[in-house]
């Protein structure tokens, strides 16, 4: 009886527990480690706005917005709650004083552009296509001023013609070591200015910039960190001088103009070169180029700053019985004007010198000097040898005949 009772009791416990378990795993409770997103509602659609008043009010309420027309504002848009601003191919222009956007209170502002190819007409015809943020003028951060603890995710749109009257970033300022900028996609910063030429026309960074894509035209003052997000498929392209200050670290990015380095460089691609002014460049910023002579000698290695060109060796290698024809990368002759962006092994190619076989004779056609020896063979000539032998035999025969007669 006891053996039968135990399985029955276990079955009853299981049946009673199933409804409770089902309710638990489908509750959507974020503390549930198995199904933490069940029942979660999607984010609300952005509010369509076509004028400054609706834009200001929606942002004040913490609502994401989508521009449906060009909008002119006269005062800074204060972002104190996390939201998304979709420029949607339109122009957001500041005509008063101050930054166009200021992010505070640990908020996250995401800027997107649903229509990056949308052309502009009329008074905006000279602006780049797509969504545009323009006209800001402030002490620092003419376009966007990002306070410490805040995050800007710039995935699209163009920040252009914004100005900082001081040295701090005509385009974007990361004001504090806890400010974070993610730049990616089609985002661009261009034609911005700052009060000091050594300052930051485009970006003044005291925090962390994730250079995951987009383009920056103009100078950058880096006193924080420039790096990549984990798994990022692209890098931001910097087309102006970058001043890497003593507190600055560069770990990623493509730099088409000079980087003036007083800080630390551990990675990146430096097509414009680096001027090192007391800074440090770690091995991670270099690539190794091997020269394999294929002549029995040990391959030579050279460290090249990533993005720079490797110099062609001044002396060609040598190999007995061969002529050197050049350095090759795979099956193609290497172009030494190519920037090095990855490890390379260059191999010497050789052409075998053809060997000459048989006898070599010297047969002059004219007698240019009295003391020249005509017809002098360089090696034994069978014809000449035969002629000499017959001559000797003939003389010997004549001698013998003469002796018999006497």
Where are each of the predicted segments found?
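Acidic Gly/Asp/Thr-rich repetitive segments characteristic of extracellular carbohydrate-active
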Residues: 30-68
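Beta-strand-rich solenoid/repeat architectures in extracellular/passenger domains
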Residues: 89-97, 114-140, 155-168, 184-201, ...
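Extracellular Ser/Thr-rich, low-complexity/disordered mucin-like segments
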Residues: 369-387
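Short, T/G/N/S-enriched strand-turn elements that build extracellular solenoid repeat scaffolds
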Residues: 53-60, 72-81, 85, 181-183, ...
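Glycine-rich repeat segments that build the extracellular carbohydrate-interaction surface of secreted
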Residues: 49, 58-73, 83-90, 325-328
């Amino acid at each position: 009886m006891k053996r039968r009772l135990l399985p029955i009791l276990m079955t009853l416990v299981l049946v009673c527990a199933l409804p409770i378990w089902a309710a638990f795993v489908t509750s959507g409770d974020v503390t549930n480690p198995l199904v933490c997103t069940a029942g979660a509602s999607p984010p609300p659609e952005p509010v369509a706005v076509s004028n400054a008043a609706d834009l200001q009010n929606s942002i004040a309420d913490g609502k994401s917005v989508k521009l449906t027309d060009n909008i002119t504002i006269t005062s800074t848009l204060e972002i104190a709650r996390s939201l998304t601003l979709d420029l949607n191919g339109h122009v957001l222009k500041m005509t008063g004083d101050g930054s166009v956007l200021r992010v505070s209170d640990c908020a996250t502002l995401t800027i997107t552009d649903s229509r990056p190819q949308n052309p502009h007409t009329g008074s905006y015809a000279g602006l780049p296509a797509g969504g545009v943020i323009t006209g800001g003028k402030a002490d620092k951060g003419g376009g966007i001023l990002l306070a410490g603890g805040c995050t800007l995710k710039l995935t699209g749109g163009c920040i252009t013609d914004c100005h900082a009257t001081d040295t701090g970033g005509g385009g974007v300022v990361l004001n504090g070591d806890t400010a974070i900028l993610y730049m990616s996609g089609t985002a661009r910063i261009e034609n911005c200015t700052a009060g000091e030429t050594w300052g930051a026309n485009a970006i003044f960074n005291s925090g962390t910039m994730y250079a995951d894509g987009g383009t920056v035209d103009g100078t950058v003052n880096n006193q924080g960190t420039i790096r990549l997000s984990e798994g990022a498929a692209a890098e931001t392209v910097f087309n102006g001088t970058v001043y890497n200050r003593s507190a600055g670290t560069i770990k990623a990015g493509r730099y088409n103009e000079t980087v003036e380095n007083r800080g630390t460089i551990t990675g990146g691609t430096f097509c414009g070169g680096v001027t090192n002014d007391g800074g440090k460049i770690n091995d991670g910023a270099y690539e190794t180029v091997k020269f394999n002579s294929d002549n029995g000698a040990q391959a030579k290695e050279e460290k090249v700053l990533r993005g720079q060109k490797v110099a062609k060796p001044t002396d060609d290698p040598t190999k007995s019985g061969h002529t050197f024809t050049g350095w090759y990368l795979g099956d193609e002759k290497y172009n030494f004007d190519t920037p090095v962006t990855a490890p390379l092994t260059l191999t010497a190619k050789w052409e075998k010198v053809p060997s000459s076989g048989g006898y070599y004779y010297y047969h002059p056609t004219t007698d240019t000097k009295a003391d020249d020896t005509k017809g002098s063979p360089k090696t034994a000539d069978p014809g000449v040898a035969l002629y000499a032998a017959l001559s000797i035999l003939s003389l010997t025969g004549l001698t013998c005949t003469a002796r018999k007669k006497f």
